[in-house]
A protein has these predicted regions:
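GNAT-family acyltransferases
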Residues: 1-120
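Phosphate/ribose-recognition catalytic cores of enzymes acting on nucleotide-derived substrates
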Residues: 125
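Conserved small/polar residues in nucleotide/adenosyl-binding loops
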Residues: 128-130
Length: 130
């Protein structure tokens, strides 16, 4: 996550779960470590271009434990209102398809938003509106 701060009202409360269009968002947290790891690793080559060009995340040898630590960090940042990461599902919640990250930025924007879906669900990317 970049240094900086998201400009939020003092009393802001981010929804932990919400429906947006045909999708359901839920806080990204450690209870989904195994499925998140599977989806991340199956899509790792494309994911290395999402946050910055030729990123090293996720590493070829990333472990389940490292993934769990990432999810613990995302949950902590969410609770501290530093950043907001959501897991993304279709409305029926039958399949975890990706993530949305709302991160602080040093640029003159309120935040940076990143979205990714698994390679197997890439066709759904254009249907998610945030």
């Amino acid at each position: 996550m970049k240094e900086g701060k998201i400009n939020l009202p003092e009393n802001f409360i981010a929804p932990e779960n919400c429906k947006v269009g045909d999708f359901y968002f839920s806080i990204l947290e450690p209870s989904i470590t195994k499925i998140d790891y599977k989806v991340v690793m199956s899509s790792r080559k494309r994911l290395r271009q999402i946050f910055r060009r030729d990123d090293t995340w996720p590493a070829e040898d990333m472990t389940l434990d490292e993934n769990t630590k990432d999810l613990i960090r995302h949950e902590s940042e969410f609770k501290q209102k530093k950043a907001f990461a959501y897991s993304v599902y279709p409305l029926d919640k039958n399949e975890y398809i990706g993530c949305i990250y709302i991160n602080p930025t040093k640029k003159s924007y309120d935040c940076e938003v990143y979205l990714w879906v698994s390679d197997s669900n890439f066709h759904m990317l254009s249907l998610i509106h945030i």
